[in-house]
């Protein structure tokens, strides 16, 4: 029986959502287990974790400078303090296992757990592991990855754990018609969902303002989340009197309903987005972020190579590309069905269950090597 598990992951949805999905699976498997999420006071977790009914313990954010800067001089003191606070949480909740998902809080969690001999489980959501999980993977044989190419020795491929609501989403024709009606869309038209994350994406917004009329003329309707900062600008740029519905919103507060309404999506290719679209079998035209280490392109490649999506570089995204590549899919029920099946085939619906099993195995090693809790 699991008595107490600490899940460390914060800052971005790519760290927080997998942690919450595993917490949900752990709670379903053992309702008596104490589950504590370790994060920061300012990250996304500060809102999401309490809203999902879990205890949030916090540590200071400790960014790891990638090059010599004055901040590097302060790193040892900041890290020492974060490890001390993480350790205090592990002691307080009498943690049996620490599960880390990368990001700022995982390094102090891994170091504090190792000092106490608490087993560690590492989950890496991206094709290229970050610094935190490269460190954590050195301390444990219990390492889960989301892509076959992830270079962590001895890792088990599990995929990204997702909420049960995503895995059970109904995308039947009847559900699609109902979801479209909730957004004020035509229940029967082919529907393109456009979103660029919580803040939108400028290049996606720009191409939609130029392509909106051509798409509408071809019979395609659009559900478009432009981002709160860009909403007014996009609203002003969209043509008026379109011959098909165009529902523009600042953001989508119910992404699952949007997935149910859509036949295809135009979006960035963050790890969570790719995993969710694969889970629900929703084909996408992926537009990776044009900066960074190429991570978003790698995220989309398995689905694209399987035939479940399209890939276009940010600089190449324009109206001509959209009309030549996305429109023919949206207007062909046969192509949509094939892409949807191919997309769904790249998902990992058992990811959370696989990580729960890994957590149990890790806890068993602790019990065999050093009993922690006296019988009461």
Swiss-Prot record:
GO molecular function: UDP-N-acetyl-D-glucosamine:N-acetylmuramoyl-L-alanyl-D-glutamyl-meso-2,6-diaminopimelyl-D-alanyl-D-alanine-diphosphoundecaprenol 4-beta-N-acetylglucosaminlytransferase activity; undecaprenyldiphospho-muramoylpentapeptide beta-N-acetylglucosaminyltransferase activity
Pathway note: Cell wall biogenesis; peptidoglycan biosynthesis
Presence of keyword Cell cycle: yes
Record has Magnesium as a keyword: no
GO CC, any one term: plasma membrane
One biological process term in Gene Ontology: carbohydrate metabolic process
Compartment list: Cell membrane
Superkingdom field: Bacteria
Reaction equations catalysed: di-trans,octa-cis-undecaprenyl diphospho-N-acetyl-alpha-D-muramoyl-L-alanyl-D-glutamyl-meso-2,6-diaminopimeloyl-D-alanyl-D-alanine + UDP-N-acetyl-alpha-D-glucosamine = di-trans,octa-cis-undecaprenyl diphospho-[N-acetyl-alpha-D-glucosaminyl-(1->4)]-N-acetyl-alpha-D-muramoyl-L-alanyl-D-glutamyl-meso-2,6-diaminopimeloyl-D-alanyl-D-alanine + UDP + H(+)
Function of the protein: Cell wall formation. Catalyzes the transfer of a GlcNAc subunit on undecaprenyl-pyrophosphoryl-MurNAc-pentapeptide (lipid intermediate I) to form undecaprenyl-pyrophosphoryl-MurNAc-(pentapeptide)GlcNAc (lipid intermediate II).
Family membership: Belongs to the glycosyltransferase 28 family. MurG subfamily.
Protein name: UDP-N-acetylglucosamine--N-acetylmuramyl-(pentapeptide) pyrophosphoryl-undecaprenol N-acetylglucosamine transferase
Native organism taxonomy: Bacteria, Bacillati, Actinomycetota, Actinomycetes, Frankiales
